[in-house]
């Protein structure tokens, strides 16, 4: 699970300005952290289908944010993809 300290660390790394918690980069980074955690969770809990639905919703939300960022500012999109190591 993501602790408050880990969340603050991610926000500080990806924020665009002081106090920024809602920019697409921050939201994508936080979703990626939660997706990574759940992916590891499913390696040991294969039959946890309720959480799998939540994972699929998060992946879809992250995809929508990435598409938005790609349309708005392609350079920021490429930077977040490379920083997080995502395939696109």
Curated annotation (Swiss-Prot):
Keywords associated with the record: Ribonucleoprotein, Ribosomal protein, RNA-binding, rRNA-binding
GO cellular component, one term: cytosolic small ribosomal subunit
InterPro entries in alphabetical order: Ribosomal_uS15, Ribosomal_uS15_bac-type, uS15_NS1_RNA-bd_sf
Alphabetical list of Pfam families matching this protein: Ribosomal_S15
Gene Ontology molecular-function annotations: rRNA binding; structural constituent of ribosome
Gene3D superfamilies from the UniProt entry: 6.10.250.3130, S15/NS1, RNA-binding
PROSITE patterns in the record: RIBOSOMAL_S15 (PS00362)
Protein's GO biological process: translation
PANTHER family: RIBOSOMAL PROTEIN S15, BACTERIAL AND ORGANELLAR, SMALL RIBOSOMAL SUBUNIT PROTEIN US15M
Function: One of the primary rRNA binding proteins, it binds directly to 16S rRNA where it helps nucleate assembly of the platform of the 30S subunit by binding and bridging several RNA helices of the 16S rRNA.
Similarity section: Belongs to the universal ribosomal protein uS15 family.
Subunit-structure text: Part of the 30S ribosomal subunit. Forms a bridge to the 50S subunit in the 70S ribosome, contacting the 23S rRNA.
The name this protein goes by in its record: Small ribosomal subunit protein uS15
Native species: Desulfitobacterium hafniense (strain Y51)
């Amino acid at each position: 699970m993501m602790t408050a300290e880990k969340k603050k660390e991610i926000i500080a790394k990806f924020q665009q300005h002081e106090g920024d918690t809602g920019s697409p980069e921050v939201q994508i980074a936080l979703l990626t952290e939660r997706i990574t955690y759940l992916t590891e969770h499913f390696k040991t809990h294969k039959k946890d289908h309720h959480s799998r639905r939540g994972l699929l919703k998060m992946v879809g939300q992250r995809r929508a944010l990435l598409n938005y960022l790609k349309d708005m500012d392609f350079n920021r999109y490429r930077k977040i993809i490379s920083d997080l190591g995502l395939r696109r």
